[in-house]
């Protein structure tokens, strides 16, 4: 008979996180018999949650900021790598002012709590945490992104960014503590969480790296690299594998053991494989969105036990808006992870002018034919500086325009006369022309492109991420262009580039309305041109699932 042996599946080491004291109110120690209990008032949970949501939308970890600085200083980084890194550092400095959030997609609020067995609370914890999320999203300049299902087919924005994902677990290792992880997860990076059901054929170094090369290329740039990449191999269930990948991408699992154990089967980090995967990402050619070396800042690889008949593998990313913070409540008070509130010292002396002299200025207020003629002179990957008027339209606006055209209405003149930016702003602070304003994922609008262009609209499109071959074919056939906008620096765009915003159509759609904006020196790159060239075509391979790799 085998011996009984137990280990936590994810045995974490000591917590080295630096915390700051938020408050001592609402926390006390009470005795029941000979036991001491930590009593936490609901108000303390509300306050902690509000503070956490504020901080993770405005501040980043110092380690993340240092990684951006390292890109700028790396002589092997491409000019486009360095440009993106500097723009993200500028964005971090603006967001740290506490007014404009770092990204316009202020995310779904995710809260994981681990409640010690000697912790007492005065109400339902999920209600108090939800109240804190509500307070943060309604009082700060954040965006409401949650869609409530009214029927199976009909949805309505909840108008307060609730509901949140809240998961609370019992914790016997920290009996008189309440520990938390707060995450603001935007749609771009959430959509790049993948589960693959593979076989043991993948479990050798050559086969795995060949398999992974293909899968990493398929991630593309829609989730705003440079990424913190997480890969989990194995798992007791598919859902456990994906959840572990999400936690690994936040660095929550960094203190895992670095070797396995045949007796208990606990998970561990493979540091050697992490380095090999990081080296692989630097050869893909994708870089920090528009070509180069820095597709990823770093990599985490976690190996988990598995059923002999199953091999789930999960891939997840945390994006350039690397938004999470740990927190804890102890007898000493309420504590929140220390994030960098003064990131100015991470900005290097390098200026935009030192990065690349080949920046092409585009006057968007010319007739569309003149804009197209100017763009046609330049190859893909060319960096642009856009000045003039853009219209902004994303998913719901495109659907409504298509429905109107199907009903016999003409293509709106604004889509014929102006370049269209796929975006949606956060709330506009008092005294600002715009709230945080950045691109959404272009691929969701791919099905409209050929039809719209054949009717004279969407000839110049601006968004983030790679697109399907159908868009490349449409642009070649119709003479159009797709320009890549940097994913991530939404606060900088709002403060420095956007001078005027007004609703143009479908006002009832809120942030998904059609907007007209005036921009100055708005950065972009040519990704797809009118000759059938696509920057991303050289960096991608067809995606296969559950295919036996070459050994």
In which residue ranges do the predicted regions lie?
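Non-transmembrane, aqueous-exposed alpha-helical and coiled segments at domain scale
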Residues: 1-231, 236-355, 435, 453
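Glycine-rich beta-strand-to-loop/alpha-helix junction loops that act as flexible
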Residues: 229-236, 387-388, 463, 487
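Feature captures the catalytic cores and cofactor-binding loops of soluble hydro-lyases/lyases
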Residues: 255-285, 289-290, 392-522
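C-terminal binding/interaction regions
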Residues: 292-299, 306-307, 496-551
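Short, structured beta-strand/loop micro-motifs enriched in basic residues and often containing a Trp
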Residues: 358-370
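Residue "hotspots" at secondary-structure boundaries inside conserved domains
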Residues: 373-376, 413
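Short, well-ordered loop/turn sites that connect or cap secondary structure elements
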Residues: 375-378, 384
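Short, charged beta-turn/beta-strand-edge "cap" motif at the junction between a beta-strand
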Residues: 383, 389-393
